[in-house]
Amino acid sequence: MVLSASEEIANSQPSGNGKTSLDIKQNEGNPQFNPRNLWPDIIKCPKNEWTFEYTDIIKRLGTDEEKIQLTKKRMEKCLMYFHKLRKEMKLFDHTYTAACILFYRYWYKYDLPPTIPQCIHLAQAILVTACKTMENNRPTDHYIKATCDFMMKDGPSPTGQKLNVEKLKWEVRDQLVSYEKKVLCQLGFDLDIDNPKELIEEIFSGYYRHVRDTDIDASLREIFPVILQEARNFIIQTGTQPISLLCDGYTLVALALIFAGVTFQKNKEPGFSFPHNFFRRRFPVIITSEIIASLFSHYQQLEKAFFDLKSNKNSALSITVDEIDKVIDEDRQLDPEPFNPYDYDIIKEGEVNEELLNYTERKIEELSNRIMSERSIKRPSEPPAEQATKKPRF
């Protein structure tokens, strides 16, 4: 991995005469400290290829049916671990999807450890990495307690053998340190997860809703939240299957929206369709009916090859090119490199309008009122006599 600021940092290192290039520049003109000389606007994550043909993903399971079933059993245990700890630790949805993405990447490149306890230790390290990447990290003891509870209830327990809880906690702690280092090194410190759950929230955030989407008609504004929620559910449910190995995050978000749009058109509003160039204006990937129909078909093949779950879409994924054409209206892109509306050089100015400022002010006021209301409920005002008897704190 090479950071874009590495050369600038190297140039600023002390030379033999004890002066840095930054010192020389400052001596030539007015002395000014510019942190951009030492650090870039953003740090670029390493870029690796994490999408593959669906046939290669299925082949990764192998050809020995007995080994395939054992592999699936270990994978199911890890996915169950993510699901249980997501509820136990009240993790964000995008942390759960990030853990599933990292898990399938690791499996595709390196396979899984041979035993279920080792797989749980691996899953714990992946979940910790996802949590550190996507949200505020939790205390280590929280992970250890939740993992031990999972191993006691759902993990393998030999007949007649009673687990020593305290001993298990120390083992889980040691394995967490070991596997976390291993996962980060083997994945090349590539934390550019391309998380579709995070992307869908960013693409349709309040900022873009008030700056970019002002031309959307009222009828679409009214029904779009329903489609957006269905797309969110679709993305979360894809975590249990290796769909993240099939396409990148932006394409998966588009896939989810089109699935939600087709479903909405079939069940509720036959005349529904996305506006002209809806995806071209919002996604830095090429979207065509043929590409999306192919992905639906490949998704269906992966479901059949991997896990039979209640969340599987099954025949609902049998969506044709004609059905997709009815809900999208995209111009053909002649340039093989699609336009990226989220390029840093384009968005760094942070243009805003009055509507966004009013929206932001309203949200801040609502948040402030809610916090004050909750605080007054949790901490009722004390009687004056009781306040007077309290000693001051130093």
From Swiss-Prot:
<dbReference type="GO" id="GO:0005634">
    <property type="term" value="C:nucleus"/>
</dbReference>
<dbReference type="GO" id="GO:0006357">
    <property type="term" value="P:regulation of transcription by RNA polymerase II"/>
</dbReference>
<feature type="compositionally biased region" description="Basic and acidic residues">
    <location>
        <begin position="372"/>
        <end position="381"/>
    </location>
</feature>
<feature type="compositionally biased region" description="Polar residues">
    <location>
        <begin position="9"/>
        <end position="32"/>
    </location>
</feature>
<keyword id="KW-0804">Transcription</keyword>
<dbReference type="GO" id="GO:0016538">
    <property type="term" value="F:cyclin-dependent protein serine/threonine kinase regulator activity"/>
</dbReference>
<keyword id="KW-0131">Cell cycle</keyword>
<comment type="subunit">
    <text>Belongs to the BUR kinase complex.</text>
</comment>
<dbReference type="InterPro" id="IPR043198">
    <property type="entry name" value="Cyclin/Ssn8"/>
</dbReference>
<comment type="function">
    <text>Component of the BUR kinase complex involved in transcription regulation. This complex phosphorylates the UBC2/RAD6 ubiquitin-conjugating enzyme (E2), leading to monoubiquitination of histone H2B and the silencing of telomeric-associated genes. Also required for histone H3 methylation. Necessary for the recovery from pheromone-induced growth arrest in the cell cycle G1 phase. The kinase activity of the complex requires the presence of BUR2. Overexpression of BUR2 interferes with mitotic chromosome segregation.</text>
</comment>
<keyword id="KW-0805">Transcription regulation</keyword>
<keyword id="KW-0539">Nucleus</keyword>
<protein>
    <recommendedName>
        <fullName>Protein BUR2</fullName>
    </recommendedName>
</protein>
<feature type="region of interest" description="Disordered">
    <location>
        <begin position="1"/>
        <end position="32"/>
    </location>
</feature>
<feature type="region of interest" description="Disordered">
    <location>
        <begin position="372"/>
        <end position="394"/>
    </location>
</feature>
<dbReference type="InterPro" id="IPR036915">
    <property type="entry name" value="Cyclin-like_sf"/>
</dbReference>
